[in-house]
Amino acid sequence: ACVGNSITYGYTLPDRETNAYPAKLQKMLGDDYVVGNFGKSGATLLNKGHRPYMQQEEYHKAIDFAGDIVVIHLGINDTDPRDWPNYRDFFIQDYRALIDSFRVANSRCRILIARLTPIADRHPRFESGTRDWHDEIQLAIENIAKYAGVQLIDFHAPLYPYPFMLPDAVHPNVEGAEILAKTVYEGITGDFGGLRMSPLYTDNMVLQHGKPLTIQGTANA
């Protein structure tokens, strides 16, 4: 079950039924999985926000779906000046209530929560509060993952270097949706494409004698 806002829904994407990240995730995972898209445009995580996810039809459908795996990406709309400045103190408890509700629906479900996708600096409210509130919500999400015992995945870092993938400063284009799907796929399967090293590490690289060298890369979990 993919739970979220318009980014999960696939808002602004041509043919969202094919190009939204949950649809792309379905193709990556194959027929052994059934992926449901329960994104609601404009939804907030905050239950006192302007459009609380837990009060939407999509939430109830996600609960009825009772998925074995639940992927949650919520918080972008909570940067609205109607929401975070007034109700920030409820964010962690509301997020934990959402997590707990999926555990009630399926006691064996595995839950992944995502760090927020970037908001580009051309967003009209970027410097008037959105940037700082976005950072505060990111930190809250990281703490929730730690204390609620759920898996944290990162929707921010893979998109951050590519602001052109956010044409309206918020919603990923088709290429960006592909990156989100790949991030979820890696988080679910532990398949990161095998051992991959930075292109800096080549057969002819020069090493400094007698100095420790930290070599970094990615590998399957």
Regions found by a protein language model. Give the residues of each.
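Proline-enriched interdomain boundary motifs that mark the N-terminal boundary
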Residues: G194-L200
